[in-house]
């Protein structure tokens, strides 16, 4: 997941991403129909539930060449990459988002001059309003949950939810949002296009709390009686996000970074020895492991050490920070070279198109075009052989590697944990993951959400936590689809 890529974020309006129209691959092999699923983790039957979810087609990905097309084994891959935030580093989400909300709301009041009546209300009062991957409709002051066909399946104006008739009055009788449809049809070309002034999806837990900041600010404006034809709240929220995640603040000890560094255990789960042992077992089998994170190395080191231990770098053959996904998977090696950084001075020494697999060398930025060559040089296989990438950001970690490279993907979707029990779920699952206001992340009223559709078509396996994988041997055959079971509507 990306984090604290300040210059890049300004250039790209804080990583505004336009979703592609998901293609129905000819390689779709398996249809998962989840009805009265018994979820089994290890040897224990942990949970059982009845679901109404419609057929969910999972692909084996375009590059799938396994003889076991309906299963995934980590042992079948030559190289395996991991995202860091919300993948290997597991955050205490309620605490993290409370911190983010409080700082962003304070910025809106103290810097932008908005009334404090709603903004400084406790985050906990409306925590059920926050859900990952909501769309912000800037001009209308609305938040939108989008269906797989681009239909508005739920929407709010400020924090007030719209009735079905209000949704039709706003978005048309078919409830099809014009900007949402444009967003779906136009993939990354629209990242920096005109739609960036109108629409934004809140793709991760670092910007998800901004939905409530935006909504409460709209409430404030409406209460004043001076309702605008077009709202202009989002640019102020965006300024607050940029300010909060400015990496220069890491060394200055201010704000967000000061809170994280001074009490990392409040926001990050401690070392998970099962995951560490699992990573080591992959390396012992000769797999080349790479860590690819959008976070800056200074911040990444703090949270990685807390989650993976002081020798965390040795778990990987190469560590790359400030990766600037999704462009990492798209650009060529000449366009986006790797930067080698001298420690401890942090001086950028030189640019290299192709890095070396050395966990003690610090790399920033770069491209898949360069990394695949390095992986191939290390294991003697073209492009590194068969490659798997594991991450949580649906666009940066799931869609882009499949669309633009020959990688296959495993999606980490923590929202699954709201519906089922899995290894470690008693410690890892936050109560907010099942939104009391928006309902299931995966569907509403029996209609599959757009994000659920993207996950099903671009990931080979979708799990609630890396723990669900680490609890099994590396040659365990995971059935393609949701594991340990399908989430309900």
Tell what function each PLM region has:
Residues 14, 19:
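Cationic, low-complexity basic patches in intrinsically disordered or flexible, solvent-exposed regions
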Residues 8-11:
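Cleavable N-terminal signal peptides of Sec/SRP-targeted secreted and luminal proteins
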Residues 2-4, 20-489:
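HAD-like aspartate-dependent phosphatase fold
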């Amino acid at each position: 997941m990306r984090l604290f890529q300040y210059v890049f974020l300004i250039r790209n309006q804080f990583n505004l991403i336009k979703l592609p129209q998901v293609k129905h691959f000819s390689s779709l092999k398996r249809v998962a129909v989840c009805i009265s699923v018994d979820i089994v983790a290890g040897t224990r039957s942990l949970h059982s539930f009845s679901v109404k979810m419609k057929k969910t087609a999972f692909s084996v990905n375009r590059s799938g060449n396994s003889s076991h097309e309906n299963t995934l084994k980590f042992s079948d891959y030559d190289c395996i990459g991991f995202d860091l935030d919300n993948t290997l580093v597991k955050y205490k989400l309620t605490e993290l988002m409370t911190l983010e909300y409080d700082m962003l709301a304070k910025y809106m009041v103290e810097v932008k001059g908005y009334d404090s009546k709603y903004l400084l209300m406790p985050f906990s009062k409306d925590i059920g309003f926050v859900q990952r991957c909501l769309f912000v409709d800037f001009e209308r002051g609305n938040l939108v949950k989008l269906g797989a066909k681009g239909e508005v399946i739920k929407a709010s104006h400020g924090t007030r939810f719209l009735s079905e008739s209000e949704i039709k009055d706003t978005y048309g009788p078919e409830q099809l949002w014009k900007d949402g449809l444009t967003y779906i049809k136009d993939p990354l070309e629209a990242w920096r296009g005109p739609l960036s002034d109108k629409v934004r999806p809140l793709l991760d837990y670092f910007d998800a709390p901004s939905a409530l900041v935006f909504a409460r600010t709209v409430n404030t404006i409406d209460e004043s009686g001076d309702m605008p034809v077009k709202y202009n709240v989002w640019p102020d929220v965006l300024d607050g996000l940029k300010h909060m995640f400015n990496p220069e603040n890491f060394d200055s000890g201010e704000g967000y970074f000061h809170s994280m560094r001074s009490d990392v255990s409040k926001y990050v789960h401690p070392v998970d020895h099962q995951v560490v042992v699992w990573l080591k077992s992959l390396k012992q089998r000769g797999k080349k492991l790479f860590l690819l994170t959008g976070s800056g190395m200074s911040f990444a080191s703090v949270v990685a050490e807390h989650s993976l231990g002081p020798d965390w770098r040795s778990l990987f053959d190469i560590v790359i920070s400030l990766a600037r996904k999704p462009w990492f998977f798209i650009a060529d090696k000449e366009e986006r070279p790797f930067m080698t950084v001298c420690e401890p001075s942090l001086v950028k020494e030189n640019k290299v198109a192709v890095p070396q697999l050395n966990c003690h060398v610090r790399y920033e930025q770069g491209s898949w075009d360069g990394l695949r060559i390095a992986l191939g040089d290390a294991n003697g296989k073209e492009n590194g052989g068969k490659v798997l990438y594991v991450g949580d950001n649906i666009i940066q970690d799931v869609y882009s590697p499949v669309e633009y490279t020959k990688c296959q993907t495993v999606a980490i979707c923590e929202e699954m944990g709201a519906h089922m029990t899995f290894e470690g779920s008693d410690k890892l699952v936050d109560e907010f993951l099942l939104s009391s206001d928006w309902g299931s992340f995966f569907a509403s009223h029996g209609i599959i959400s757009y994000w659920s559709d993207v996950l099903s078509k671009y990931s080979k396996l979708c799990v609630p936590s890396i723990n669900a994988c680490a609890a099994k041997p590396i040659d365990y055959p995971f059935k393609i689809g949701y594991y340990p079971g399908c989430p309900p509507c």
